[in-house]
Amino acid sequence: ALSSAASDVYKRQAYNNIEKNEAWLAAAKSTIDFIEAHCFDSDGRMYFEVTAEGTPLRKRRYIFSESFAAIAMSEYAIASGDQTYAVKALDLFKRMQYFMETPGILAPKYLDTLPMKGHSITMILINVASRIRQAIQDESFNGQIDASIDQLRKDFMHPEFKALLETVGPNGEF
């Protein structure tokens, strides 16, 4: 099985931050091509796992695959100078927001009998927005970043425990 998007993020970040190694850039482009050809379902959501040949194995209820793909596309745009990948990352980010805001698209983690929420999506949105903002030089992503930080502070940060809690009740209660 292959988790392409996450692997690709590391290759691009290595190229952008460690060494301008053309082999890394070529590997990143190959991975992006694979992601685009094999990792999206017809509903616009991504598979979580596919085989090396691109056969889908598993699709999850959350948007982490989409998040890593958007980060990968942003990093590739920065590394290669090809802004079409920044636009693709932006489009994917907007699709992620639609998935999160539209009831029924993403299955809830818990049934209503266990009302709680986690910080994982909130935190990954900071990273995704930051990377796309860097790729397209668009300060409008500050709103998403600020909203995510505000939600972390309001609901998940608990100074009484000297901790940022991973899961809390619907209103941030422990």
Language model regions located:
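Loop-centered beta-sheet repeat module
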Residues: S120-F174
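Well-ordered mid-protein domain cores that form the structural environment of catalytic cofactors
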Residues: W24, K29-I78
